[in-house]
A protein has these predicted regions:
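Glycine-rich beta-strand-turn "strand-cap" elements at beta-sheet edges
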Residues: 620, 630, 653-669, 689-728, ...
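Helix N-cap motif at beta-to-alpha junctions
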Residues: 633, 673-679, 738-741, 780-786
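Non-transmembrane alpha-helical segments in soluble domains
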Residues: 112, 116-123, 237, 323, ...
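Residues forming the flavin
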Residues: 2-91, 130-614
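Short amphipathic alpha-helical segments
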Residues: 633-654, 679, 685-696, 739-764, ...
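Long, well-ordered early-domain segments
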Residues: 99-141
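A short structural micro-motif
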Residues: 114-118, 256, 475-480, 690, ...
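Short glycine-/aliphatic-rich beta-strand segments at the starts of folded cytosolic domains
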Residues: 621-627, 729-735
């Protein structure tokens, strides 16, 4: 059905040409080939414009092809379908607080309005499909109106064989971030790779991917299962080519053409000489910003006084061409941003075995590896050459770099060392170094990785003060055992926790998913320096992505997108995906403006405002399964439940796994969360048809599964590592509800729970969707004594139970006290 819609859109978009039309004429000329460029090209072609894309390099895709591919798109349709509905005021308020004086309400509102339509357009009309990031939080969870999820999407895996002969023109993923050239998707897929030697299901999952990849290498000389940013570019390219867009590589733009003050095309350098391409509707500049333009870096990056002290992970061909082209016809580059670049720590990976990792003056001999996720894993710290920690290592890459710049004395080069032990590097890897069974020797030989059999020896190899480093590690180890980082708050935000590893930490009896002792030698270090994922400072534009002059007037026929457009975030970084989300959206907007079309006509808004006050946010579905087990089998059953719930074909998320302590004994309670009833139903079918439901077919004596929907005002249940909610005593209470009493109960609980929550947290309140009308609520307590004291205090203060609440309930009331098993995400 999706293919039929796509073929229909293709027919609608046949370019309007005549037999006498010159070869180098088009309606819209797009300079560049990253996400912003191809979003513009695909949308314009769908709207009926003839489009030519010219790319400076030998392969299309730009920095996007190397990226994680995530896009920040609040209120996107996948979140809406999962029941995560929010008013536009929520993300608007978050950005207003985050951006401060840089907040541009017109552009921000335009983005928040059109971004959901952009996603809906591409998934309904093109080859590009998405996966949701509904559990990915914003970077700064302490800022009011930050979200715990529902604001991110990523391109779904893409089969590059669909590109045919144009496959070889697609820029492959950054080799150092792959396994033998095979991209690995973030999230569940990455966890399978980390667990491939530890869990049979993960071993099987990884084995299948490797088999296909090696087959691809034999047949195509490269992988064809694309993920992350490579999948985004692959799907956009297929969509563009199918819509008749011409993509030319090795075709840098030399200068823009103008007539009567309007940009009408550009002169392009080709192997046969220069050619002029006329563009009747305008030109889009999307050449990737200036991450490798020394002159502009010297001007806009204070930590790069010569322009060479900044090592960007962006594509080497991004040298500021679009900015210079825009300036040549009256455009202005924004120079007042808080930061001109999307800062990130990078390590310098030698391209050749004889190249030392930090050899001065030989930048072309190194790949710039961005450290995006390793810093948050438990058992790693970052220190300066003096041996001191200076930051919360689990914070975003941008915030980490801000802290490093602040800790660097004037006149010194910003640099730090990431320190870990042998257990860490063999499980997680470090930077470009892969985990076991991949060898360490090549990295030790070329100097990228430093090793010491004691912390003093490691310090000597790195030029770090040995005494201070030893004291820093000792202090950190003590904090890790307590699960608290009083110095920098590591592990305290939802973003920190989701980047950590709660499962591995809990297996070691620790509490903080981002902290574990550094104690098992040898010890290792990789140096990181000041870098970025791209640049923020670009050509000033209006809400239509039109380039404006110093007076704020649009330059007719000229648009800027991607990193050639000044970031609407003003140099701040409030969430992952704030580069690609706006890039895709403003490309979509620019194409409509060039075609003189309204985006609302192209695609119905997939995320309308809630029409009544009864439509709430964060609706989630749950299954609570109750198994009766033989005495002494709880540990075995829990392990099998975890394996069953994390199989590749499993849907939903394991949230809680408890064993009863008071009430009906020898029962295991398993709570799983789902984004939709459809997903829950499919997983229920899988469980029931399994030869061994929950992996416990040979153990349990009875199994009962109940479907629930969370009270609509409650936030979704999250593991302890993300929510901070812990027991270890959990009370699971179920009440029958009188006919007609459901809405009154929901409303009363919404009114009374916030005050009661301050005494002990309500994990969830949820109404059963099958069987008698009833609801179940789960509370967490530190101990049985704490439960008794808190319940008494709540009654004494008059904050619980809700006044008038019992009148809506039946006499069916059941209470169970349960303790978390070792595999329970709720601890």
């Amino acid at each position: 059905m999706a293919e039929n819609r796509f073929m229909q859109s293709k027919r609608m978009a046949e370019p309007k040409t005549s037999p006498h039309e010159p070869e180098n004429t088009c309606d819209l000329l797009v300079i560049g080939s990253g996400a912003g460029a191809l979003s513009t090209a695909v949308t314009a072609a769908y709207l009926g414009l003839k489009v030519i894309v010219v790319e400076k390099d030998a392969q299309y895709g730009g920095t996007t092809a190397w990226s994680g591919g995530w896009m920040w798109v609040p209120r996107h349709p996948l979140a809406l379908e999962a029941g995560l509905v929010e008013r536009i005021e929520k993300p608007l308020s978050y950005l207003r607080r985050e951006l401060g004086a840089q907040f541009d309400e017109t552009r921000v509102l335009t983005f928040l309005t059109q971004a959901p339509r952009m996603v809906e357009f591409f998934r309904k009309k093109t080859a590009l499909q998405f996966i949701d990031g509904n559990t990915i939080p914003d970077f700064h969870g302490r800022t009011p109106d930050a979200s715990l999820g529902g604001r991110s999407v990523c391109a779904a895996p893409f089969d590059a064989r669909k590109l045919g002969h144009r496959l070889n023109d697609l820029r492959p993923p950054l080799h150092e971030t792959t396994l033998w050239g095979m991209g690995i998707a973030a999230g569940a897929e990455m966890r399978h790779f980390l667990n491939a030697l530890h869990k049979p299901a993960s071993f099987w999952y990884v084995g299948k991917l490797l088999f296909r990849h090696f087959k691809d290498l034999l047949l195509h000389r490269r992988g064809t299962r694309l993920v992350n940013g490579n999948a985004l570019i692959g799907a956009l390219a297929q969509s563009a080519l199918d819509l008749g867009v011409e993509i030319r590589v090795n075709s840098p733009a030399v200068r823009l053409l103008q007539k009567d003050g309007r940009v009408t095309g550009a002169v392009i350098q080709t192997s046969a000489g220069q050619v002029s391409i006329q563009a009747s509707h305008g030109v889009m500049l999307a050449t990737g910003g200036f991450p490798h333009d020394p002159a502009r870096k010297k001007q806009l990056l204070p930590h790069a006084p010569t322009g060479h002290e900044h090592w960007s992970a962006g594509n080497r061909g991004n040298t500021g061409d679009g900015l210079r082209l825009g300036e040549s016809v009256g455009g202005v580059v924004a120079e007042d941003m808080v930061q001109a670049a999307a800062l990130a720590p990078v390590s310098l990976v030698p391209k050749h075995s004889k190249t030392r990792a930090l050899e001065v003056g030989s930048d072309n001999n190194h790949t710039h590896f961005p450290h995006l996720i390793d810093r948050a894993k438990p058992g790693l710290i970052a220190v300066t050459s003096e041996g001191f920690r200076f930051a919360n290592e689990a914070d975003s890459y941008y915030d980490f770099m801000q802290a490093l710049l602040a800790a660097t004395p004037a006149g010194k080069k910003p640099e730090a060392w990431l320190i870990c032990d042998h257990h860490f590097i063999r499980y997680y890897g470090l930077g470009a170094v892969k985990p076991a069974p991949m060898p360490l020797r090549p990295w030790l030989s070329n100097g990228y990785l430093k090793r010491g059999f004691s912390t003093a020896e490691l310090a000597a190899h790195c030029g770090i003060d040995a005494t201070t480093l030893q004291a820093t590690i000792q202090k950190y180890n003590a904090q890790a055992l307590l699960g608290k980082d009083p110095d920098f708050g590591k592990g305290e935000t939802a973003y920190n926790r989701i980047q950590g590893d709660a499962i591995r930490v809990s297996a070691r009896g620790l509490r903080n998913p981002c902290m574990a002792p550094i104690e098992h030698g040898p010890f290792y270090a990789v140096q990181v320096v000041a870098g970025s994922l791209g640049t923020f400072a670009g050509l000033r534009v209006n809400e239509h992505a039109q380039v404006i002059n110093p007076q704020g007037l649009a330059i007719p026929g000229l648009y800027a997108g991607g990193n050639d457009m000044n970031s609407m975030m003003g140099g701040y970084y409030p969430a992952g995906g704030i580069t690609l989300g706006p890039a895709m959206t403003f490309g979509f907007i620019a194409a409509h403006h060039a075609a003189k079309r309204d985006p609302a006509e192209t695609c119905i808004d997939p995320a309308p405002q809630p029409k009544t006050q009864s439509t709430k946010e964060n609706s989630m579905y749950y299954e609570l399964a109750t198994m009766t087990l033989p005495f002494g089998t709880a540990a075995q059953a829990a392990s099998q439940v975890q394996e069953f719930a994390t199989q590749p074909e499993a849907q939903g998320e394991l949230l809680g796994c408890w064993f009863t302590d008071i009430g009906v004994l020898n029962q295991m309670l398993v709570l799983r969360g789902f984004s939709s009833l459809q997903a829950l139903g499919e997983e229920r079918t899988r469980t029931q048809r399994s030869a061994s439901p929950f992996g416990c077919g040979g153990l349990y004596q009875s199994l009962e599964q109940t479907t629930y929907q969370g009270f609509p005002w409650m936030k979704p249940v999250r593991p302890s590592a993300e929510s901070g909610i812990t027991g270890p005593v959990y009370e699971i209470r179920t009440y029958g509800i009188q006919p007609g009493g459901l809405q009154a109960t929901v409303d009363l609980w919404e009114q009374y729970v916030p005050a009661r929550d301050k005494l002990s947290p309500c994990v969830v309140a949820m109404v059963a969707l099958d069987g008698p009308l009833r609801f179940t609520n789960i509370w967490a307590y530190d101990s049985l004594n704490a439960r008794s004291q808190i319940r008494g205090e709540a009654v004494a203060q008059g904050i619980w139970p809700p006044k008038g609440g019992p009148a809506h309930l039946t006499t069916h009331m059941v209470s169970t006290i349960a303790m978390p098993t070792a595999v329970s995400p709720l601890k």
